[in-house]
């Protein structure tokens, strides 16, 4: 028997409480966590070099979780005992599933977030490159889904890029919160074994440790903050998807062929299927975040098995977010803008403003004067669409020159963000390299 008991595929209790399916997501991270623990026991003198070597060799051979186990931790320990023998039981010294799963979750989420942040930057670059092509491409803007004022497609694209940049900064800050080590905290109050928690954290590439062992083993608040921000990002992406569906339906843009499908009956149809799926995945993400918060809200402090039911939702939300960023990268790299004739009523605001300035009368007076002409059907503007855009005098407007300068500013910010995430990633890799060096030394 190990922990509670060995189960079987027919054991209803084991099957009911088992987390094996969701644990497959963290196999490599659980192994890495165990390596750090074994090395820590070796460095502090609790484990002999030969025993440590055998365990580390066996760890590298573990590939899959069999059936009949409560979780990956039970499966891994059973595997090690069968491979190494009784000496593998030393891994239980100073270790709990509680601190090990908390560590593995953070390692996995860290890797996923670094990948996602890199992907977001790739999409931002695509948007800025495309914006440079469309600085003078006339495009309508809308409020209440009604025609508002003339803008450019570059103006729309840089709006998306800045939204993504804002989300990027917040998600990067959650990454820093996630990248703290719970390892060495035991089940709840630590352990009598003199484990160097800070050394373990360093070997695993963490920035620091979570000091309080109760918090380290039972808190999921940092992860929930991350999933919350990813869900906000998905909501932002869903709005963009809705825009693209609307623009496509109104013949303002042509979506890439790879992002549309036709009807089984109507051969002329170009259905925006990828954007429809993105909207649905955003809704699912909201539902999964709600499930996570609902599970977590009533738990007493300390580890409870309810926490394992949260794990599957972490990976679903982050995988949905990553795939959605990838789909939008593909779409925007190929999107085409159609030639658009914008109704001249969209120039009414410009005429009212110019009239107020030239006559030196309150804007509300000229507003009503222009509005009356629009209602009567007698409104005619003397402006061209391009004039309307280039008269805009504020930073962030679609004015051609100001937009060209804004794109340069945004490109500089993107390069800074690219450098920041790359340096952060390399710092982690460097620390993990030290763990590998020690493992190699033990294996000699």
UniProtKB/Swiss-Prot annotation:
A Gene Ontology term for the protein's cellular component: cytosol
Catalytic reaction(s) noted: 2-(N(omega)-L-arginino)succinate = fumarate + L-arginine
Gene3D superfamilies noted in UniProt: Fumarase/aspartase (C-terminal domain), Fumarase/aspartase (Central domain), Fumarase/aspartase (N-terminal domain)
InterPro entries assigned: Argininosuccinate_lyase, Fumarase/histidase_N, Fumarate_lyase_fam, Fumarate_lyase_N, L-Aspartase-like
E.C. numbers: 4.3.2.1
Any single biological process term in GO: arginine biosynthetic process via ornithine
UniProt-recorded Gene Ontology molecular function terms: argininosuccinate lyase activity
Disulfide bonds listed in the record: none
Key words of the record: Amino-acid biosynthesis, Arginine biosynthesis, Cytoplasm, Lyase
UniProt superkingdom: Archaea
Top EC class of this enzyme: lyase
Record Pfam families: Lyase_1
Alphabetized CDD domains for the sequence: Argininosuccinate_lyase
Pathway: Amino-acid biosynthesis; L-arginine biosynthesis; L-arginine from L-ornithine and carbamoyl phosphate: step 3/3
Location in or out of the cell: Cytoplasm
Family per record: Belongs to the lyase 1 family. Argininosuccinate lyase subfamily.
Name assigned to this protein: Argininosuccinate lyase
Organism: Saccharolobus solfataricus (strain ATCC 35092 / DSM 1617 / JCM 11322 / P2)
């Amino acid at each position: 028997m190990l922990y509670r008991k060995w189960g079987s595929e027919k054991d209803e209790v084991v099957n009911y409480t088992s987390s094996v399916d969701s644990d497959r997501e963290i196999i490599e991270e659980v192994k890495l966590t165990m390596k750090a623990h074994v090395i820590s026991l070796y460095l502090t003198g609790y484990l002999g070099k030969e025993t440590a070597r055998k365990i580390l060799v066996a760890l590298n051979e573990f590939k899959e979780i069999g059936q009949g186990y409560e979780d990956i931790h039970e499966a891994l320990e059973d595997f090690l005992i069968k491979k190494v023998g009784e000496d593998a039981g030393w891994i239980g010294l100073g270790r709990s599933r509680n601190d090990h799963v908390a560590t593995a979750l953070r390692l996995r989420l860290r890797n996923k977030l670094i990948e996602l942040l890199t992907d977001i930057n790739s999409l931002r670059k695509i948007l800025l490159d495309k914006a440079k092509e469309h600085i003078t491409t006339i495009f309508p803007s809308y409020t209440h889904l009604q025609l508002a004022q003339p803008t450019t497609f570059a103006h729309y694209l840089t709006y998306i890029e800045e939204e993504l940049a804002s989300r990027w900064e917040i998600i990067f800050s959650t990454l820093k919160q996630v990248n703290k080590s719970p390892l060495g905290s035991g089940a709840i109050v630590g352990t009598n074994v003199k484990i160097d928690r800070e050394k373990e954290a360093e070997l695993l590439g963490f920035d620091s440790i979570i000091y309080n062992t109760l918090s380290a083993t039972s808190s999921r608040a940092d992860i929930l903050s991350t999933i919350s921000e990813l869900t906000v990002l998905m909501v932002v992406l869903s709005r963009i998807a809705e825009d693209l569906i609307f623009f496509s339906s109104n013949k303002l843009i042509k979506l890439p062929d790879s992002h549309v499908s036709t009807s089984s009956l109507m051969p002329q149809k170009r259905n925006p299927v990828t954007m429809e799926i993105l909207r649905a995945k955003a809704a699912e993400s909201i539902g999964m975040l709600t499930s996570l918060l609902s599970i977590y809200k009533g738990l007493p402090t300390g580890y409870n098995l309810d926490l394992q039911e949260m794990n599957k939702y972490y990976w679903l939300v982050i995988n949905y977010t990553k795939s959605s960023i990838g789909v939008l990268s593909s779409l925007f790299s190929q999107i085409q803008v159609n030639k658009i004739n914008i109704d001249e009523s969209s120039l009414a605001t410009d005429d009212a403003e110019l009239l107020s300035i030239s006559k030196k009368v309150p804007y509300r007076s000229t507003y009503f004067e222009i509005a009356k002409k629009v209602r009567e059907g007698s409104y005619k503007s003397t402006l061209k669409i391009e004039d309307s855009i280039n008269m805009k005098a504020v930073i962030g407007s679609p004015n051609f020159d100001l937009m060209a300068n804004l794109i340069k500013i945004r490109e500089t910010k993107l390069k800074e963000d690219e450098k920041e995430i790359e340096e952060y990633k390399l710092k982690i890799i460097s620390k993990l390299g030290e763990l590998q060096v020690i493992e190699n030394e033990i294996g000699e």
